[in-house]
Structure formats: C-alpha cells, structure tokens
C-alpha cells in the first residue's frame, strides 16, 4: 500500500515539474525583460521624454547623440 502511494506521488511530481517547465519556457519567450531593448541610433530625430522609443544615448537639440 505504501509503495503505491510513493509511486503515485513520484508520478505526480514528474507531471507537475514537466508542466511547469513547459510554461516557464513560454513565459521567457513572451517576457519583455528578455526581449532586446529598442532605441534610436545617433542622428535620428527625437522629441524628448514624450517619445515612445528613446534614444540609445541622449536627446539633444531634437537629435539623438
């Protein structure tokens, strides 16, 4: 009886860990922290803090530097 319970617990642990690993890989692909950060290269026009994509450097005189 005890052996059946141990086998059942082991199988459940294996199923749960496989399921969690599969979902963690999906989360990594969708995570914005993992994705490459986009920024404007030097010479591109910029508009300060209100623009959606920031400069890679600094916005000076409406141009990224």
Curated annotation (Swiss-Prot):
Annotated GO MF terms: calcium channel regulator activity; toxin activity
Q: Which residues form the propeptide?
A: 21-37
Q: Which cysteines are joined by disulfide bonds?
A: 39-56, 46-59, 55-64
Q: In which tissues is it expressed?
A: Expressed by the venom gland.
Q: What is the residue range of the signal peptide feature?
A: 1-20
The domain of life for this entry's organism is Eukaryota
Instruction: Report the GO terms under cellular component.
Output: extracellular region
- Where does the protein principally reside? secreted
Where would you find this protein in the cell?
Secreted
Keywords, comma-separated and alphabetical: Calcium channel impairing toxin, Disulfide bond, Ion channel impairing toxin, Knottin, Neurotoxin, Secreted, Signal, Toxin, Voltage-gated calcium channel impairing toxin
Q: Which family does it belong to?
A: Belongs to the neurotoxin 36 family. 02 subfamily.
The domain comment in this protein's record states: The presence of a 'disulfide through disulfide knot' structurally defines this protein as a knottin.
| Function comment | Reversibly blocks N-type calcium channels (Cav2.2/CACNA1B) in rat dorsal root ganglion cells. Elicits no toxic symptoms in either vertebrates or invertebrates during a period of 48 hours post-injection, when it was assayed in vivo by direct injection into mice and cockroaches.
The protein in question is named Hainantoxin-X
Organism name:
Cyriopagopus hainanus
């Amino acid at each position: 009886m005890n052996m059946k319970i141990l086998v059942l617990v082991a199988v459940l642990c294996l199923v749960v860990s496989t399921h969690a690993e599969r979902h963690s890989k999906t989360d990594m692909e969708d995570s914005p922290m993992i994705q490459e950060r986009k920024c404007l290269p030097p010479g591109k026009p910029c508009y300060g803090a209100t623009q959606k994509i920031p400069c890679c450097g600094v916005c000076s005189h409406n141009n990224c530097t």
